[in-house]
Amino acid sequence: MKNIMLHVCGLLMLVFAWLACSDSPKAGRTLRVGFVPAEDAQQVMQNAQPLVEILRNELGMEIQPFVATDYTGVVEALRVNKLDVAFLAPASYVLAKNEANIKVVLKSERKGIPFYYAALITRADSGIKTLEDLRGKTFAFGDSLSTTGHVFPRKMFKEHGIDPVRDFKQILYSGGHDATVLAVLNGKVDAGATYANSPDNEDTAWMRYLKDPQDVKKIRAIAFSEPIPADNLVISEALDPRVAQKLVDIFLELSRDPKGKKMLRDLYQIDGFVTASDKDYDSVRRAFTGAGIQLKEALQKKKS
């Protein structure tokens, strides 16, 4: 009888141990984190490593980072449940929300402001001063699903009666903000679309990617868009709610910590996060309409 009781107690202990492990959000899980390639994908992966380490340590989970070759790659990975959490640009989020079972939880801030801008840039010596001056010129968009590198600039052009296909001499899709800035600086194109964190030329893409202050002075903004709700963090609805809440807590804490702020700025030139909701991005949905871009068609064209 004593041996039987020992076996029973042993089995009960194993059962309780298994239940405790299965109840833990950390048990046997790999968290798959997606990053949009706002710049060179390898550079994004490198900049993401400190964050990956923090998530690994704080969650006690293995972290699997994924940087797509373009914005569509992250949207598609969310659609087929290959990611648990992802950093998305506003336009990518609007597309992903239509395709995937996701929820936006946080949006980024820059200098305490949860907005940023599309900026149309040229060389300071180009003679181009207005959008009308772009007719007959060469122009670089970023990724075709980029918020500031394509969607909002297209809306700006349409509002001014400019059809890039008809009115520009040549259109280039650079694939990233860094490439667009360099294309303009080096004279590969006459002008291009990128981002600025403020419309006062104090925190811009060309300041980030051009290390020589003299090169920065060679770039001038022609126009800025309306304020755009900032890029965000989304989670899969299938993710354990406890892990999801822990992620939110981690990013909010990073937003309050000077070292955390630097890490986020190195990654996507942001300073922190605040809570977000889907309705925050209604203006981006309107921008697609204003640009004459259908959501479904935008994603299908990119896939093909």
Predicted regions mapped to residue ranges:
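Short helices/loops that flank or line small-molecule/ion binding pockets
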Residues: 72-86, 99-100, 132, 177-197
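Pocket-lining segment of extracytoplasmic ligand-binding domains
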Residues: 138-242
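Acidic, polar ligand-binding/catalytic clefts
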Residues: 76-133
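An extracytoplasmic/periplasmic, membrane-proximal ligand-sensing/linker region
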Residues: 28-50, 235, 239-304
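Bacterial N-terminal signal peptides that target proteins for export
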Residues: 1-9
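C-terminal motif of bacterial Sec signal peptides marking the signal peptidase cleavage site
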Residues: 17-20
